[in-house]
Amino acid sequence: MKQLLLLTSLAVCFSCSDDNNLIVQEYIPTDDASFVGKAVGNFSKEEWFPGGELGTSDDVSPSSYEAPTPATDNQGLTQNFKNGETFFERNFNISTPPFSGLGPAWVRQSCIACHPGYGHGKRQTIYRANDYGNGYLLVVYHPTAGTDALGNSYAANSYVTEVTGMPQTKAAEPFLPPIDESGIHISWPEAAEGALPFTFPDGETYSLIYPVVTIDPEAFHTSPVPTNYECRIESTIGIYGSGLLDAITEDDLREQYRAAAPYCELNPAMWDKAANDFAASAWYTLADGTKAVKRFTYALTRASLQDGAGANAIWNITNVTRSDRHKLYTTDAWARAMSETPSVIDAILADPTSPYRGDGTREGAAQAVKTLLSPTTDQTNNLFHNFAEEMKDRDYYDFMVWHRGLAVPRARNLQSEEVQRGKQLFEEMGCATCHRPSWTTGEDNYWAPENIKAQGALPKYPRQVIYPYTDMLQHRLFMLNDIRTGWCRTTPLWGRGLSLQNTGADDRLHDCRARNVIEAIMWHGYSRESDAFSTTQKFYNLPKADRDAVVAFINAI
């Protein structure tokens, strides 16, 4: 359902939320229509259209993150886009098609629950998967190398194997969730002063907060439970414009790495400094064996959008199977624990319709549970119960039309002298080194799996000049309780100034620790080791009017 007015959209989107601290800002339309598409000050006419001619929407309303690209409409894919959108917005359930197949364990019931208003998740103080806007994924990992309870060795910063990489906190009866939410604790202490004081030279002050997340050992319903673990949280980001980033060529990505390598340390997992080329681990193997360079997610774990975070999430967030995903997103440790839980077996044996009964004995039911909940079992072809595929290929295709077809909202207020001053400072201070303003897409001969190609074409964005404000590389900021590994891909800035009116929140950075743009900038300089410390120091020393101009620029692009 499209949002026409901010207050209406908030009434709809937040009706099931317990968040009483939501900041609602009245939607005030921009007064720049007569300037759009014209060169103004230090902005070219093209900069009004950050997604290029084929990827920009003129919609800057409180539903602007939801608009289709002109390419989607030009290719006659509007109806597919609309159908695909429903699979993003609707709650999946256990048994009623076409949104059936939820579980047996899941992270969220819908995509939009994590991407409120199609944007960035909101900061949370309590972890509840059912709270709208909670875009957090738990990251449970080993801070140091060691050996697990089964004798398997693991490396430092590796994910625990007892729960999934995106851990689940919900499960269908009679199963218990892999992690009990009541055992997850989030606190937000204020940071002590870092490398730069919390008072600007002109007297204005700011503060920084950061998340501390713990999970009680008894909250894990796995066998064995993890040991030597820590937890972080990572929030969802805006998904509009992803198709345009997918259209950047690998040659251009390589040139960006080569241009940056002499001036900063790059993640050795992505860049082989000695060879001056991509590292072996920078390449991702797609379903048909094609090798492609990783470019998506904070951790750079995915290469093609059609096998990227969204294509994966419609399966593993909900555990809804499809023709190319016949297995569950689970762990053997959870499957084993459920097979050993008396209440689970009791409930299964008491239900004559349960697919987990096996031969009807306790031992048979336990074996069926252990097998059917395993991540290695083909759900459609096994010894115990052959489930049907839960998402049709046509619906998955429409979902990917929608995903690749989301437009970037046009820029706003570029005629403003304050915004123009902000752009000048942004470039002079060196912000544009990592937040690279512009790329030009290639021919966009995108990769797609067979179940997509068999249905039709996806939106394409050939030869578009785009302005995402990201170098597509990972950098390190050395923040308190930093992201796992410390390496984080530069988040695109395009459209972020519309976050508050689209989502009801303006939280920034990978875990929403920054409550506004100023805090996001100052976290870049919290540590002298940060890749962005010198740039942040320059911002810190600006007079207030110039700091405000930089913020105005970031909110305009």
Name the predicted role of every residue range.
Residues 1-7:
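Sec-dependent signal peptide recognition
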Residues 85:
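N-terminal cofactor/phosphate-binding cores enriched in small/glycine residues
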Residues 9-10, 98:
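Residue-level detector of alpha-helix boundary/anchor positions
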Residues 17-19:
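Long, low-complexity intrinsically disordered regions enriched in Ser/Thr, Asp/Glu, Pro/Gly
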Residues 12-15:
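C-terminal motif of bacterial Sec signal peptides marking the signal peptidase cleavage site
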Residues 21-82, 92-400, 404-417, 423-557:
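Electron-transfer interface patches adjacent to heme c in soluble/periplasmic c-type cytochromes
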